């Protein structure tokens, strides 16, 4: 990877000024002291030396692998699952968090104190924010914690994570006067509980750049898209195996025009064993964007539509025939939708099927 970074930096005339990690830095939080020492000694420090940077230039967030599962209180866990069910209860928790619930990830504050030396401008139990001047452009880095609700159970946690709109808004307030707002968070938004996803989406798209991770499957790979005029970059697993998508990204921003590019780098195993362009998503393995073009009217329109969406869905659900005339209550459109049976057929097989139907 180091040689690949040097190659891209030379070819594209890029200077690396910051390094961001979006979680799953170690294998298990229960071994955090040993594993973090190994992570920094064998990966981070060589990377910093290669790029000429130091601990003032790295930013990171915890992922589900950082959770110390030995610290999870099963009774506190059962209680929090039954309580955090809507926007009001989630907001109340963030205003007065329970130490028993956060015990599984509390050690990560020590990791921040030991290994992140960037200028800190805000911190609480969940979030840390930093302010950095890069080539006369002021960047605000908000490191959000989406992993605090994880219990290390993997895919079954989808739809159960919580970021909390309060956490996002506190971070935005802390970096409100910077030129470029950058958000680091581990879980994609579709891993959040439904009520939290609605609230967080409305707030988080005030960031210019949103970096997240957690996606380890070939289906998702690396996703970059405009959402509310924010650029979202989701990176796959960084581990040299054939069964997962592996890669990283280099984000380049022109300090004068705020025009940017994201260079998508994918690891190719087998005979090559190297990083190269990811051509599966974008031509030439590069995504181009422009920051700073936020239309206040479009933002307001997005907020209005976003606010009425839950109420409209609830209202429309009441008109299901099964809700009106039947005895079974259908809670949502998702509950009523039946996935059609799909299959792969050649043109010859399809013609036989059509003939049988005729």
For each predicted feature, which ranges?
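Active-site environment of divalent metal-dependent phosphoester hydrolases
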Residues: 26-30, 60-75, 151-152, 187-195, ...
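Divalent metal-coordination and catalytic microenvironments
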Residues: 19, 24, 39, 63, ...
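Active-site neighborhood of divalent metal-dependent phosphoester bond hydrolases
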Residues: 48-123
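A short C-terminal boundary segment appended to hydrolase-like catalytic domains
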Residues: 253-356
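Binuclear metal-dependent hydrolase catalytic cores centered on His/Asp/Glu-rich metal-binding motifs
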Residues: 91-178
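N-terminal active-site segment of His-dependent metallophosphoesterases
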Residues: 1-38, 47-56, 68-69, 170-177
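Active-site-proximal segments of metal-dependent phosphoesterases and phosphodiesterases across multiple
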Residues: 146-215, 220
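Conserved beta-sheet core of the metallophosphoesterase superfamily
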Residues: 136, 190-262
């Amino acid at each position: 990877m180091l040689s690949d970074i040097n190659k891209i930096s030379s070819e594209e005339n890029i200077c690396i000024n910051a390094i961001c990690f979006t979680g799953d830095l170690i294998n298990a939080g229960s071994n955090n002291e040993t594993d973090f020492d190994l992570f920094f000694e064998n990966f981070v420090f060589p990377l910093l030396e290669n790029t000429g940077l130091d601990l003032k230039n790295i930013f990171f967030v915890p992922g589900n692998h950082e959770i110390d599962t030995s610290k999870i209180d099963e009774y506190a866990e059962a209680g929090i699952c039954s309580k955090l069910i809507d926007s009001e209860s989630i907001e109340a928790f963030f205003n007065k968090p329970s130490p028993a619930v956060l015990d599984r990830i509390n050690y990560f504050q020590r990791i921040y104190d030991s290994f992140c030396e960037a200028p800190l401008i805000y911190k609480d139990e969940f979030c840390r924010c930093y302010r950095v001047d890069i080539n006369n452009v002021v960047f605000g880095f908000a490191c959000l914690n989406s992993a605090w609700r994880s219990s290390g159970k993997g895919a079954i946690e989808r739809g159960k994570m919580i970021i909390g709109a309060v956490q996002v808004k506190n971070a935005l307030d802390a970096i409100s006067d910077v030129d470029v707002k950058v958000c680091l968070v581990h879980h994609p938004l579709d891993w959040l509980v439904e009520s939290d996803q609605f609230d967080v989406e409305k707030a988080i798209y005030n960031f210019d750049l949103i970096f997240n991770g957690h996606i380890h499957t070939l289906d998702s790979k690396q996703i970059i898209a405009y959402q509310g005029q924010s650029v979202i970059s989701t990176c796959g697993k960084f581990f040299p195996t054939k069964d997962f998508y592996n890669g990283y990204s280099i984000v380049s921003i022109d300090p004068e025009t705020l025009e940017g590019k994201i260079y998508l780098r994918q690891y190719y195993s087998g005979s090559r064993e190297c990083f190269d362009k990811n051509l599966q998503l974008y031509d030439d393995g590069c995504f181009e964007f422009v920051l700073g073009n936020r239309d206040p009217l479009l933002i307001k329109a997005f907020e209005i539509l976003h606010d009425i969406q839950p109420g409209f869905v609830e209202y429309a659900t009441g008109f299901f025939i099964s809700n009106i005339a039947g005895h079974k209550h259908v809670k949502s459109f998702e509950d009523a939708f039946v996935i059609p049976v799909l299959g792969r057929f050649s043109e010859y097989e399809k013609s036989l099927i059509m003939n049988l139907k005729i």
